[in-house]
Amino acid sequence: MSSAVSASPQAASPQQDRTSGLSARYARALYELADERKQLDEVVSEMAALGRLFAEDPSLRRLIASRSIDAREAGRAMEQVLASQGVSDLVRNFIGTAIANRRLADLPSLVAGFAVYVAEKRGVVAADIASAHPLTDTQRAQLTARLAEAGYGRVTIRETVDPSLLGGLTVRIGSKLYDTSLKSRLQRLRHVMKGAA
């Protein structure tokens, strides 16, 4: 576990940087408006529910990813989804603005960006952990302790299982990626062996 924090961070790709900047702008605008209207807790809860919905509903992911759907059709479809979730006018307007600005495909990253922005404002750091197998409670506690030692005091861990990693894990905090997966180790070994041949 200790190597997860001591590995060299890798920079985010230009696409991630663009999306992160976009997400941050949208997140800041929604946060400030929700705070001003004294609806922050409600909006945080609704955006978290939308994030779970985007992650769990394959038909919604297909709608979002489709390049062939007209913005008006997408807006109507998303309005139905939002109505079924009972979200506030503030969140409806936020999603509607994103769609009107041709950001339908970016909705999951905008929702995730809002969660990151809220966590930062509250002094909590989000760590995205991908592992080949689900983490045990002991591993989770060790990882949290190692992250605290590395200067990430209050950490919220978001876990995903990615069998393609083969073993080990990756930890992404902001734009830093700590990769101790067996997959990346094998790729580095393959690269070194090609250079020696």
From Swiss-Prot:
<keyword id="KW-0997">Cell inner membrane</keyword>
<comment type="function">
    <text>This protein is part of the stalk that links CF(0) to CF(1). It either transmits conformational changes from CF(0) to CF(1) or is implicated in proton conduction.</text>
</comment>
<protein>
    <recommendedName>
        <fullName>ATP synthase subunit delta</fullName>
    </recommendedName>
</protein>
<keyword id="KW-0406">Ion transport</keyword>
<keyword id="KW-0472">Membrane</keyword>
<keyword id="KW-0139">CF(1)</keyword>
<dbReference type="GO" id="GO:0045259">
    <property type="term" value="C:proton-transporting ATP synthase complex"/>
</dbReference>
<dbReference type="InterPro" id="IPR000711">
    <property type="entry name" value="ATPase_OSCP/dsu"/>
</dbReference>
<keyword id="KW-0375">Hydrogen ion transport</keyword>
<keyword id="KW-1003">Cell membrane</keyword>
<dbReference type="Pfam" id="PF00213">
    <property type="entry name" value="OSCP"/>
</dbReference>
<comment type="similarity">
    <text>Belongs to the ATPase delta chain family.</text>
</comment>
<keyword id="KW-0813">Transport</keyword>
<feature type="region of interest" description="Disordered">
    <location>
        <begin position="1"/>
        <end position="20"/>
    </location>
</feature>
<feature type="compositionally biased region" description="Low complexity">
    <location>
        <begin position="1"/>
        <end position="16"/>
    </location>
</feature>
<dbReference type="GO" id="GO:0005886">
    <property type="term" value="C:plasma membrane"/>
</dbReference>
<dbReference type="InterPro" id="IPR026015">
    <property type="entry name" value="ATP_synth_OSCP/delta_N_sf"/>
</dbReference>
<dbReference type="InterPro" id="IPR020781">
    <property type="entry name" value="ATPase_OSCP/d_CS"/>
</dbReference>
<comment type="function">
    <text>F(1)F(0) ATP synthase produces ATP from ADP in the presence of a proton or sodium gradient. F-type ATPases consist of two structural domains, F(1) containing the extramembraneous catalytic core and F(0) containing the membrane proton channel, linked together by a central stalk and a peripheral stalk. During catalysis, ATP synthesis in the catalytic domain of F(1) is coupled via a rotary mechanism of the central stalk subunits to proton translocation.</text>
</comment>
<comment type="subunit">
    <text>F-type ATPases have 2 components, F(1) - the catalytic core - and F(0) - the membrane proton channel. F(1) has five subunits: alpha(3), beta(3), gamma(1), delta(1), epsilon(1). F(0) has three main subunits: a(1), b(2) and c(10-14). The alpha and beta chains form an alternating ring which encloses part of the gamma chain. F(1) is attached to F(0) by a central stalk formed by the gamma and epsilon chains, while a peripheral stalk is formed by the delta and b chains.</text>
</comment>
<keyword id="KW-0066">ATP synthesis</keyword>
<dbReference type="GO" id="GO:0046933">
    <property type="term" value="F:proton-transporting ATP synthase activity, rotational mechanism"/>
</dbReference>
